[in-house]
């Protein structure tokens, strides 16, 4: 079921009961936008028909690059008391190991929920993409107060749907599971018992938990103003402001593809010069090169038109590539990417100052995204700690700390900075100990001890 249809169905179900009536903050306008961003990321944009308009796969490239920059050389760990060792082991193995891929999904679709849950073997983490959850309400700090998660599968002619509703009310977390079965995609169908579906038979219909001041998941959203719906607290795709620019870029890319296809070398050859194979009911081409030759019927003699004519027009690739490259630069600006990220870096006709400004713009956005991801991961670890303590895997309490180290190489060229520091040492404005401490990861005391002895000069 499409995301916008699912939103309507979920709202209708919740509003049937006075106890669950909601004023959904996720509007149909935002639902349609999320559908578009998802289609663009999955290479199914509405303007792409695979014939006249091909996809240059720009949305996926943008989301992938931003996710790479955000998680580049990222370091994070959980330290502290007795619980920290267990939490950190699960955190490193089940969260950080494959985090970049899920951050890419979040960047593409505007948001991502990181939701821990308990299994028979311990903690697990579910990554819910923006087209599979429905935030119903938020608090003033931007944390979700109520959210619906959906899961759906087909079995024969029946469609099974599970709604998992998380609500924070009066310092209590309420989790409910409701299951529906239908025979079409137009509605969720009839509600049935949760235990009647094998896949969900171990889930409880209702659960209430005390001792948490937030819902038990982390919510990552792209830190951009929502230009699609300025009243919505939801995140937007990293390419949300470039959909029309990307559509034009796909058109220009398609023109380039057609230029190469339409100007392929060909030989127009008269039918009279070809041998006709009666057994196969077709003409035979010299050397079997059907792609090279194009059969032509001439109604006039050879004096008016040669029997063999070579078709080899000039390719206008330079002009077309320049136009495509210019479009990519517009996309880079709209998506907070430095010039040369998507476009040809050799053709970036910018001054050193302009290039630095574009890198600074990208760095600022990446830094904001890193902080948004950090908040989501902190909430995730809080939820992991809650579940692990609830099931007796660790002692109760919050005796842990989460640390983060983010890379800044997007704006700082390490080799260039190192060369500058060497010049400062030569001028005497930076000591050798300071240089060694900075570049060798030593304290000033260690660096001073490790400096080479000055060479003895004989008089």
Q: Where are the regions that the model predicts?
A:
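Extended, non-catalytic structural segments that build the interaction scaffolds
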Residues: 31-53, 298-334, 350-373, 401-434, ...
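Extended, regular secondary-structure scaffolds
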Residues: 108, 113-236
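Active/binding-pocket-proximal capping segment
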Residues: 331, 345-352, 376, 383, ...
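Alpha-helix capping/termination and helix-coil
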Residues: 328, 332-339, 366, 370-392
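Long, highly charged low-complexity segments enriched in Glu/Asp and Lys/Arg with interspersed Ser/Thr
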Residues: 439-459
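Extended, helix-rich architectural segments
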Residues: 1-145, 154, 158
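Extended, charged amphipathic alpha-helical segments
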Residues: 198-354, 401, 405
